[in-house]
Structure formats: structure tokens, C-alpha cells
């Protein structure tokens, strides 16, 4: 069956290691859209951080952001939004007080007070980079719970890989773990992990499934391309699941199709192979 919807992760997938969109990716995406294929960017990034990437692609597309919590167009029209109940966020923060140094609250707001933090240790170079790229959105508040005046999109933690795995294990074992979902994005080479605590029903896969149903596409007509653990659910849903050559090793050993690395234009290669080939 022909591919009618292509879901593409951003970091480590669409973008190369310099943060650019390789020309081969741009050409393949444009060719797919010209054939009537719909494209969705599906990312852990929040909307305002993903939008500049979307705007580099001069084609209509849907943005599934915050690991599936929000679905929006480039023009800002919202199709779906699932927020983390503030009381669940409060309970999570209370149960992870010893990880407070790397904790953030993210809200669906304009620039001001979009990201709240209590205290951050900037010794990790990746965390310093996060600060540099997001400083205009960051506001300090003590205690962090005081910022829960409305439901957040998520509670986000940043830290080393081993530290965040320990946190993930703790969150999985809490008695109220059914109140939230946990998504992890690991960068082992940088020893840096983003751990997101979201609404219990949120994942890239769930959002992609709902969007495909809304658009009238069967799973067999959906292609997904990703590289990290937070892409697993959408890869499991898609009829054609493709992992990047630079993906986490565990992702490449699950019997999925493997394309080139993000520096080799692996997204474009996959689209050429599975969506643009003549049948």
C-alpha cells in the first residue's frame, strides 16, 4: 500500500549533527509532498523550539511536539492538547526532590514563563547549551511547585545518562505511576538525557495514531523515521518503521528498517526508498 503520511523526528533524524537539514532530506520531502504525501514533524521539542525547523521546510506540514502532547500547524492552529494534571506534577516533584537540580516545568504559554526552574547545575556542557538556546523562555521560581498555577505540558528532567535511568526506574515504581507517562531521550556520546513526565496517555505513537485516524490513513499507509527511545511507540504504530544509522543501538536491533545516518541524509534516503519508489 502506498505511503500517505510520513512522520519524521527532528533531532538526530531530520537534522544533521550541525543542526542543519541536509539538501537530500529537503528534496525528498518536497518530492513526497508534491505527490500528495502528508508530512508531520514528530518531536520531543516544544512548539516554539520546533517551529524554526519546520519553517526551513517550505511545505505544508503538521507539528506533533512535546512527545505528542500538542498537535499544531506552523500557523499555530491547535488540533490536540493533553496536559499533565498539576496535582500529578506536584506529586512527581515531591517524590523526586533529590533530582530537583535538573527539573523544569514546561507550559503551553507565550514566551514569558514558558519554562520554570528552581535551581540548575550548569556543569554539564549539554545543559549549558540548553540554557543558551532557551534562556529567553526560562524563569526561576522557588519552590518549583509554586509555579503550578495551571496544568503544565510536562515536568522535564535533565542530567547524565545513568542518573536519568535511575530516575526513570524510580518514577516507574511510584504508587501513582498510572497518573503519568515517562519518555526518555538519551545522548550517550554527550552523557546527557532528557526525561519527560507527561499526561498518562501521551506518546509520539499515540499522537501519530490519532492524527492518522483523523486524516483517514491506515497504519499501513504511515511511515515513521526516528532514532531514539522516545520514537519507539510511533515506530511500532507505523506500517513502515525506519531507524537512523546513528540511532541508539537497541533501536537498530528490533528488526526495523535501517537507513543512513543523519549526517548522510538518511531521512531522504528512506523517503526515496519507501515513499517515492515506483510500484
What is the predicted role of each segment?
Residues 36-40, 59-61, 153-154, 220-221, ...:
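Short active-site oxyanion
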Residues 20-128:
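Active-site phosphate-binding/coordination module
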Residues 1-8, 30, 34:
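Non-catalytic pre-domain segments flanking phosphatase-related domains
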Residues 106-225:
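Conserved acidic, metal-coordinating active-site core of Asp-based
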Residues 57-59, 67, 176-178, 237-238, ...:
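Short, structured coil segments at secondary-structure junctions
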Residues 1-5, 21-22, 194-279:
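Mg2+-dependent phosphoryl-transfer enzymes with acidic/Ser/Thr/Gly-rich catalytic loops
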Residues 32, 43, 67, 155, ...:
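Residue-level signal for inorganic ion chemistry
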